[in-house]
From Swiss-Prot:
The keyword Transferase applies. This is Lacto-N-neotetraose biosynthesis glycosyltransferase LgtB. It comes from Neisseria gonorrhoeae. Pathway: Glycan metabolism; lacto-N-neotetraose biosynthesis; Bacterial outer membrane biogenesis; lipooligosaccharide biosynthesis. Adds the second galactose to the lacto-N-tetraose chain in lipooligosaccharide (LOS). It is an enzyme of class 2 (transferase). GO terms for molecular function: glycosyltransferase activity. The lineage of its organism: Bacteria, Pseudomonadati, Pseudomonadota, Betaproteobacteria, Neisseriales. Belongs to the glycosyltransferase 25 family. The keyword Zinc does not apply. One of its GO terms (biological process) is lipopolysaccharide biosynthetic process. Keywords: Glycosyltransferase, Lipopolysaccharide biosynthesis, Transferase. Its EC number is 2.-.-.-.
Length: 279
């Protein structure tokens, strides 16, 4: 298995974390130098995802994260490999990860390398909907189909045909239809146009930040992307037509009723959903 870890060349602490995490399991890996806002990023966007450059709300860091995945896929396609495993440099690995990442016989026995597929290895500890896939369990983990949004791109396996699908799709989408790369891959299933995503359960990996949050612990590595997303949500609200005195007054007067309705909707949305565990 080719394991690629997206990481800034200057991120010494995170690279040391990855070297220890993968090295202690005997899992081979190679770093892929992540992009940052730069001329290199602008060239990559112009070549692969032209609509991204003009996106009004995604920050430079979010665009760089998006393009780091896209450029890595393009590199893998140029090399002619049938599939790759992709990780981000704040990932934690679960028990027996070497059974999945130090070999790939299990993958070849369960998936056609010439088909389009994604195996999501990560959990974000959010409620998700899955359905049976018919893929046989391996190493005490199942491969159900992901039927709802599940954020994050800290760990996944993607086939050559799936890489080509996403790159071709990203190349023609206008700015308003582009979102952070994790939502493009693992957001609304209808947006994937039939691209199957299997959600490993229990998950093989998790982002250190979200693992810490889920267990009420302090994060050792943090997340620049999370910070940028919070700022962008605030900016979108400030720029929204709904952010006028009249609309703010109406929202204040109807807040209790809206909160009650939101709670009802959340209860309905959680029916049948699970939190994918990490172990």
């Amino acid at each position: 298995m080719q394991n690629h870890v997206i990481s800034l060349a200057s991120a010494a602490e995170r690279r040391a974390h990855i070297a220890a995490t993968f090295g202690s399991r005997g899992i081979p890996f190679q770093f892929f130098d992540a992009l940052m806002p730069s001329e290199r990023l602008e060239r990559a966007m112009a070549e692969l995802v032209p609509g991204l450059s003009a996106h009004p709300y995604l920050s430079g860091v979010e665009k760089a994260c998006f393009m780091s995945h896209a450029v890595l896929w393009e590199q893998a396609l140029d090399e002619g490999v049938p599939y790759i495993a992709v990780f981000e440099d704040d990932v934690l690995l679960g028990e027996g990860a070497e059974q999945f990442l130090a070999e790939d016989t299990w993958l070849q026995e369960r998936f056609d390398p010439d088909s389009a597929f994604v195996v999501r290895l990560e959990t974000m500890f959010m409620h998700v909907l899955t359905s049976p896939s018919g893929v046989a369990d391996y190493g005490g983990r199942a491969f159900p189909l992901l039927e709802s949004e599940h954020c994050g791109t800290a760990g996944y396996i993607i086939s050559r045909k799936a890489m080509r699908f996403f790159l071709d799709r990203f190349a023609v989408l206008p700015p308003e239809r582009l979102h952070p790369v994790d939502l493009m891959m693992f957001g609304n299933p209808d947006d994937r146009e039939g691209m199957p995503v299997c959600q490993l359960n229990p998950a093989l990996c998790a982002q250190e930040l979200h693992y810490a949050k889920f267990h009420d612990q302090n994060s050792a590595l943090g997340s620049l992307i999370e910070h940028d997303r919070r700022l962008n949500r605030k900016q979108q609200w400030r720029d929204s037509p709904a952010n006028t005195f009249k609309h703010r007054l109406i929202r204040a007067l109807t807040k209790i009723g809206r909160e009650r309705e939101k709670r009802r909707q959340r209860r309905e949305q959680l029916i049948g959903k699970i939190i994918v565990p990490f172990q």
